[in-house]
Amino acid sequence: MRALPICLVALMLSGCSMLSRSPVEPVQSTAPQPKAEPAKPKAPRATPVRIYTNAEELVGKPFRDLGEVSGDSCQASNQDSPPSIPTARKRMQINASKMKANAVLLHSCEVTSGTPGCYRQAVCIGSALNITAK
């Protein structure tokens, strides 16, 4: 009597192993596939804006005045780092580049206090120029 259940279990196991199974195929995702966007071309690098400190350096060079340009560096409170004139000059160059200028004639750079929102502020002012090659 004990042999009967053992024989039945052995028969069932061998019967199941004889079944042929097809390999499982991966389930297709219902989420939309991200579309491959074409690579965006990198923005052209802006040409460097040269700073002239003396108007005599421009004698003999044809140029067009594009208007006044400025840059600033702000110290919000007395615990912040002090305002930097080199940072103000760099920001002036960036603003001139946005005006399609390739040079700036620097008029003045100074550190002031009492500007709303700033404990102290460095400001540089100049003229944005487009110098053409001869």
Curated annotation (Swiss-Prot):
Main localization (coarse): membrane
Phenotype for C124S: Does not activate the production of capsule polysaccharides
GO cellular component terms listed in the entry, alphabetical order: cell outer membrane; outer membrane protein complex; outer membrane-bounded periplasmic space; periplasmic side of cell outer membrane
Lipidation (S-diacylglycerol cysteine): C16
Keywords: Capsule biogenesis/degradation, Cell outer membrane, Disulfide bond, Lipoprotein, Membrane, Palmitate, Signal
Short name of one Pfam family: RcsF
Protein's recorded name: Outer membrane lipoprotein RcsF
Gene: rcsF
